[in-house]
Amino acid sequence: MQNMNYYYDFSGQKFNHPLSLSINSFDRKVFSRQTSLELSYVLKGSYEVITEHISHSLTEQELAVIAPDEIHILKKLQPESVILTIHIDFERIPENMLGSCKNLFHTILCTPVSNAALLRSLKEEIRRLLMVLFNGDSADGTDLFALNEIMMKILCIAKKQRNTPFEQLPVDSTHHENYVRAIQFIDRHYQEDIHLTDIAK
């Protein structure tokens, strides 16, 4: 049974908008890959971010930017943990508005110690986004001009980040080698019908 004490969902997909935002305490069990840029901001507790190159714990008020098409999982480390997740889906943005987004974005972790300036900038846009979403009423609805402006600002902030040298990527988990093997297997067989027993082999 999922904990619904902390739950909010704005699904832009319902009206073909690229941006979605959710707040929940769900416990993710599977790796995922999306065409969207993902921002995951820890509101309470802690989560482990796992990709092919990263396995690192994030605590309250820390953030992960997950690049499009990156196979990843965010594992809840404490029962009462709560996370805010934003997705900006490039398949719902006309290409003539952005051009090619391939390799423009990189997965990066933002903490008060690492990428602190980026963390501050993205936190401010998250704050503005929540104000727009929560202040929309049933008569006027959400201010789409403000929503679009914030969405584009988030993309501009996130795309300016440079590659981090491989040896500087955070790898904390003792299980990282197993995670890498699982991610690489999923990547090779992504279009096939695979099961956990296949990955375990």
Predicted segments, located by residue:
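Residues that scaffold the ATP/ADP-binding catalytic core of kinase and kinase-like folds
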Residues: 50, 95-97
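Short, well-ordered alpha-helical segments
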Residues: 121-128
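Generic protein-terminus/edge-of-domain signal
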Residues: 1-64, 69-70, 76-78, 102-104
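Ligand-binding loop in jelly-roll beta-barrel domains
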Residues: 69-93, 100
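Short, Lys/Arg-enriched, Trp-marked, Pro/Gly-tolerant hinge/linker segments that flank
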Residues: 109-121, 134-198
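Hydrophobic, helix-rich cores of sensory/ligand-binding and other regulatory modules
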Residues: 65, 129, 143-147
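Append "Primarily bacterial transcriptional regulators
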Residues: 61, 197-201
